[in-house]
Amino acid sequence: MYEFKYHRPGTVRQAANLLAKNEDAKVIAGGHTLVPVMKQRLASPPHLVDLSHIEGLNEIEMKGRSLSIGATATHFEVANSAIVGEAIPALAELAGMIGDPAVRHRGTIGGSLANNDPTADYPAAVMALGATIVTNKRRLKPEEFFQGLFTTALEPDEIITKVLFPLAKKAAYVKFRNQASRYALVGVFVAKRPSDVRVAVTGAGSNGVFRLEAFEEALKKRFSHKVLDGLTVSPEGLNSDIHGSAEYRAHLIAVLARRAVEAATAKE
């Protein structure tokens, strides 16, 4: 690990100013993504701006008909929050599936979204629920925020402050995980919202999280796993690696989408 200067701002504004003044500075919260690559000397940011001590940035609360989760809320806090469990149980369940206890106690929702790992779980929930990513500068919809593998719309001095999740009538997340890393080989989040149905997939796309529009159209007519019978997913544009071929992932997506709908309807 190379030498760096550590900053511990007390407010989001102070953090943003530090990022603006220090070229190549990096934000850190839980550190589960950045610290390992720094140890391997694959990254050597001269400045680290730690958000974990900013008061209120991990707050979880209801705001009208939306669930607000602060950027530094850990996976453990999301998974075990009574507010999240009551408002969107599927989101609490998703957070409880992430990594192992050590990862869940340190990793944060904001860090996961900012990193935009193509196998991460939260992007599927954000996309399916139509959440809004709030930063110190603006509000972004999922389609604006996610811009490809490990790429987002965040500017160099822009910081995620919270995520606003609209409530869904029914929702569920199902994933087939890599047994070693527990990352999603394929993960499918299904959400029946007041106005529509959205089905989002993580872990499989060569360009990150994406939606299954054909499945959404079928489920709008009738929210039942039976309407998905006969629907398939094209392997075109899907990942193919040592963990599974594109064809295998395409099959998994269709299977998990049905299971997610079954899980969502079983909670009635």
Kindly label every feature range from the protein language model.
Residues 1-268:
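C-terminal structural segment of proteins
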